[in-house]
UniProtKB/Swiss-Prot annotation:
This is tRNA pseudouridine synthase B. NCBIfam families: TruB. The active site is at D47. Keywords: Isomerase, tRNA processing. Belongs to the pseudouridine synthase TruB family. Type 1 subfamily. GO terms for molecular function: RNA binding; tRNA pseudouridine(55) synthase activity. PANTHER family: PSEUDOURIDYLATE SYNTHASE TRUB1, TRNA-PSEUDOURIDINE SYNTHASE.
Length: 310
């Protein structure tokens, strides 16, 4: 006899506005506790010292996490000039200092070199694995290593404020795997000075933005008032970029059993026009209910992820 899972079968996404000085893992635990959810996860770590958008998946929504991990992101961050640190933020130990304070005009003139597909070396204090160990663990232990350069995409990078000579605030829109701290490190170097991240806020992950975000304190208050459903977004929220196909009740039943369904020629043509080059992923919907994520091949939809939603 299968062991009964603890908690409720809650499924959906929560757009959390993560507070300062809280790990992403702890944030997930507190959200799960508020909903009494059986399982949960997040779509991309947000540093403890950062605030902002942390999409959290509960229940069946955890099956859609990989699709949001690849989503574009947006940040607002403030650079403090004059000091390099081990962690590239204000918590690290000082590794270098400079009296150079770039003007706003100098910063803006340097930014075009950072836009587009660029080479970036991730920070040593990061969750990237090195020979099976997290880079930040090796860095804390004093192990010397350098992570390999990798390609990242930065779509937009601009100055939005300069409160004083020691600080400048920027916004950035970028693809997956881009580190704000590495951008700040490289920008400071290009400007002949030192600098680190003084403040960091993530403002968007895919379709999850500040407009739909909820603070942890607000969420926990809703828990006391039994109004948590107001904060929960549908499982398919993370699949906005994936073409959807309405299926019949009979086809929904077949997909739920893990069996393929045959598409009509017009359905194949419609989906081909909507799918990005090289992509075959389609979401099958029965009314407002997500039935399965499927792969379209040879005129059929083959279920890859089946959802147990009511």
């Amino acid at each position: 006899m299968a062991r009964r899972k603890k908690g409720d079968a809650v499924s959906g996404w929560l757009c959390l506005d993560k507070p300062y000085d809280l790990t992403s893992t702890t944030a997930v635990s507190r959200v799960r506790r508020a909903f009494n959810a059986q399982k949960g996860g997040h779509a991309g770590t947000l540093d403890p010292l950062a605030t902002g958008i942390l999409p959290i998946a509960l229940g069946e929504a955890t099956k859609t996490v990989p699709f949001l991990m690849d989503a574009d992101k947006a940040y607002r961050f403030t650079i403090a000039w004059g000091r390099d640190t081990t962690t590239l933020d204000r918590e690290g130990e000082t590794t270098g200092t400079s009296d150079v304070r770039p003007t706003r005009e100098q910063v803006e003139a340097a930014l075009p070199a950072f836009i587009g597909e660029v080479d970036q070396i991730p920070p040593n204090f990061s969750a990237i694995k090195v020979d099976g160990e997290r880079a930040y663990d090796l860095a804390r232990d004093g192990v010397e290593f350098e992570l390999p350069t990798r390609k990242v995409s930065i779509f937009d990078l601009k100055v939005v404020d300069q409160p004083d000579a020691d600080h400048v605030t920027l916004t950035m829109e970028c693809g997956k795997g881009t580190y704000v701290r590495a951008v700040v490190r490289d920008l400071a170097k290009a400007l002949g000075t030192c600098g680190h991240v003084a403040d960091l806020r993530r403002t968007r992950v895919g379709g999850f933005s500040e407009a739909s975000a909820i603070a942890l304190e607000t969420l926990e208050n809703l828990s006391y008032e039994a109004r948590l459903s107001e904060a929960l977004l549908p499982v398919e929220t993370a699949l906005d970029d994936i073409p959807a196909l309405a299926v019949t009740d009979e086809d929904a039943f077949r997909l739920a059993q893990g069996r393929a369904i045959v598409l009509l020629p017009r359905q194949v043509e419609t989906l081909k026009a909507e799918l990005p080059p090289g992509d075959r992923t389609v979401s099958a919907m029965s009314g407002d209910r997500l039935v399965a994520l499927c792969e379209m091949r040879a005129g059929k939809l083959n279920p890859v992820r089946v959802f147990q939603l009511t």
